[in-house]
Structure formats: C-alpha cells, structure tokens
C-alpha cells in the first residue's frame, strides 16, 4: 500500500500581523465549565431531636414538633432530620394516630388554612352584574327549540316502532 503525500500548499495571501499590541489584563480570565454549579460546602444541621430524646409514640411533646397545623407529617427538608430519625418519627406518629393519641387530621385548622390559601390565590372577589336579558332570552329560546325537536324525534321513533 502506497499512500501519496500531497505537498504543502502555501496560501497566496501574505500573513498579516495585528497592528494593535496585545495587552494582558491584570485579572486572569476564568473559564467556568459549569456556570450554575451548586456549591458543595459541607453543612451540619442541628437536629431538633436532642441526644436524650426517645422517639416514641408516647412522647407527644416531641411528636407535635413534626406535625403541621393540618395534622400532616412534615417532610425531612422542613424537619431537618436524618433519614433514620424521619422514619422513626413517622412510625411514632402513625402509632399515636392508631392508638388515638393524635387525630388523623386537624379539621379546624385545615378549614382555616384552606380559606386563607384560597383568598391568597384568588384575591378579593367582586361580583359583577353580567345579567343581560336579551342574551338570556335568546339562549332560552334556542334551548326550547332544541327540546321540542328532540321530543318530535322521540315521538316519530315511537310511532314507527308501533307499526
């Protein structure tokens, strides 16, 4: 196998040097590989469970810290617990509910919470008078026509089936 090498071709245009001198900036140029990278600094959260606290369904003062106003179990992110602690707390809460130490849901607070949430989302409600008598009359007359046509069709079917 013989591979022919082609000669290096020179370009016909001459190489132009830049007339502006190259100035190095005082700050080094930083090239970020991932611009929105999350910082990986170690963090230590203080647990809401003390070293002497027993996670048990009878320890109501401890359990009540990990339940929301509506009676729901709060998430690990909110509780700032380890996985093992969260599992034990969840089991204790469920046992307390079954043994009727805790309600399954706190309906009084839940109703208040829902009312507040709805008012925040929708804002104040203003009723507008949108009643236009001409349009409602037109709509009702169309509805009456449709109903009468439907009745006629049903009568025709009944007559044809009788024969």
Curated annotation (Swiss-Prot):
Q: Name one GO cellular component term.
A: chloroplast
- InterPro entries listed in its UniProt record: Ribosomal_bS18, Ribosomal_bS18_CS, Ribosomal_bS18_sf
Any idea where this protein resides?
Answer: Plastid, Chloroplast
Q: Which UniProt keywords apply?
A: Chloroplast, Plastid, Ribonucleoprotein, Ribosomal protein, RNA-binding, rRNA-binding
Task: Give a GO biological-process term.
Answer: translation
Q: Which Pfam families match?
A: Ribosomal_S18
> Region Disordered: what ranges?
1-52, 144-163
Instruction: Name where it mostly resides.
Output: plastid
Q: One MF term in GO for this entry?
A: structural constituent of ribosome
Compositional bias annotation for Basic residues: 7-48
Disulfide cysteine pairs (residue numbers): none
Write out the similarity annotation: Belongs to the bacterial ribosomal protein bS18 family.
- Can you state the subunit structure given in the record? Part of the 30S ribosomal subunit.
Can you name this protein?
A: Small ribosomal subunit protein bS18c
Question: What species does this protein belong to?
Answer: Saccharum officinarum
């Amino acid at each position: 196998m013989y591979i022919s090498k082609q000669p290096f071709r020179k370009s016909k245009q001459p190489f132009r040097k830049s007339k502006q001198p190259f100035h190095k900036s005082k700050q080094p140029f930083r090239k970020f590989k991932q611009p929105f990278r999350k910082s990986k600094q170690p963090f230590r959260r203080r647990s809401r469970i003390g070293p002497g606290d027993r996670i048990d369904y009878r320890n109501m003062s401890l359990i009540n810290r990990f339940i929301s106003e509506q009676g729901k179990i709060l998430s690990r992110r909110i509780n700032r617990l380890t996985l093992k602690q969260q599992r034990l707390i969840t089991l204790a809460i469920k046992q307390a509910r079954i043994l009727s130490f805790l309600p399954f849901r706190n309906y009084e607070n839940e109703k208040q919470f829902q009312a507040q949430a709805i008012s925040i989302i929708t804002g104040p409600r203003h009723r507008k008078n949108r009643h236009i008598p001409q349009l409602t009359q037109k709509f009702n007359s169309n509805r009456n026509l449709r109903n009468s046509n439907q009745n006629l069709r049903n009568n025709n079917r009944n007559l044809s089936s009788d024969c």
